[in-house]
């Protein structure tokens, strides 16, 4: 009781500055009035709890809604970040550390932040945008500087919400039981969405205009919510940036998830268990007793190949009833308005981590040429492609043929771009295209963008191009933070277009249509299955006006990944091993023996021509 009395004695000035808000369950809280980096006022609430802390026996379980509280909650402190690994590969280089969590790591991390333009007015009913961060489902937090919601909120007059959700094993361990049902991170997101749907009207939000938007694993999460019947009532529109439920890293089958638990159990020295007859009770007991840091330190043990994240959503029969491709084919998803897109150089960022022999850290910032010949390129490709492609010479040859540079001379940058496009198409762009195309074919309105501008404030080397994730800076208005960054006027104009398109979409379902009924200067056409028109998001001097409208993008290459290659793999699987042995022998005969015979025959012909020419000359 003394604590309650002291609380009200020492906090009246804060409470009068920002009035208390009582949630619909009666829980009181207050935030703070702050200024955006552009000098405009807003009200910010940080670290509002939406779930009970998932600690103790709640570790690995679905989240439980936060119980009501009586004492006013001080929502002015950034929340904990969920337990996760940090990127130390490039030391203290800002380009990598900017994605590391910037608040205390804890299992007690299920909180959300709310940004409201001006003062809270429950009668305004503004459109609401819920941000879902990326990070491969193994990292990420709502509090990163690049996700600072102040500029987007005040410049576009929207309410922005950003929630934390559990990542890695804490968010996605699947054991086929209530103590570890899988998809806990997705249930965290859904509980936050329910909180917003229930309470955002008290902050001035319109519960009939709630838009989910996310990037990478956040985009995959958003599209998974589109597939889940559990999520459908709690949002109305969706934006996916460089990720989809059909991305090869986004969802895994149950048997794979269970096998990964066994591998981690053995890696943690809990015992030595066979994959054939595992004891899941013993595995779960080990994980529940383990220190959080021990789990984090061993979380990558099950990973065997590039683009394979250890703990991701699973088709659990509850949150997800079927795989994403089946849902898209049959139209089992929320048909609404969808804004989707990808970046020009999606995978280069990841290649540098995966191929240290090709991209040594010691030379990373001083060199610009790393892949100088076909042999190095093929070696890198083989280190990056999934096993199901590598195990057959036919499928590997098809991929190499599709992406190998042909125009001579071939530069180091050509080889690098070919590798980037191969992996970027496979892991990101083509899956976003697949989602956009399915949504359109089943009657949903879709708008597609392609981000092609390399920012002047980009800290990564110039040869890396337009990286995965770096459209986020423009969407959240970073170029207008002129006290910290030195973007150009053109880049501020580009950021303004990004913010306006995204906010218009949240408000009206159409990036072109302003809330007052007027339209933007440049018209962004709807995406369709025939012309596949998209908006090239870049600075004005690169593609002025309607010249920014393109078709595709990457249409031919995505047809290769989504149609030709799967059909080839199916055909190869049907013919059986004897045919494959014969085919490999035939390939060797054609590529080695015949080539060798042809070489000697050509040499013989040249010799005969030379003799004839020499004879004619001598006899003349």
Swiss-Prot record:
Q: Is Nucleotide-binding there in the keyword field?
A: no
Glycosylation sites per record? 74, 272, 486, 536
Q: What is its EC number?
A: 3.1.1.7
An annotated GO BP: acetylcholine catabolic process
Which keywords fit this entry according to its UniProt record? Cell membrane, Disulfide bond, Glycoprotein, Hydrolase, Membrane, Neurotransmitter degradation, Secreted, Serine esterase, Signal, Synapse
As given in the record, the signal peptide range reads 1-31
What does the record give as the function of this protein? Rapidly hydrolyzes choline released into the synapse.
What family does the entry list? Belongs to the type-B carboxylesterase/lipase family.
The entry's protein name is Acetylcholinesterase 1
Q: Which organism is it from?
A: Caenorhabditis briggsae
Gene symbol of the encoding locus: ace-1
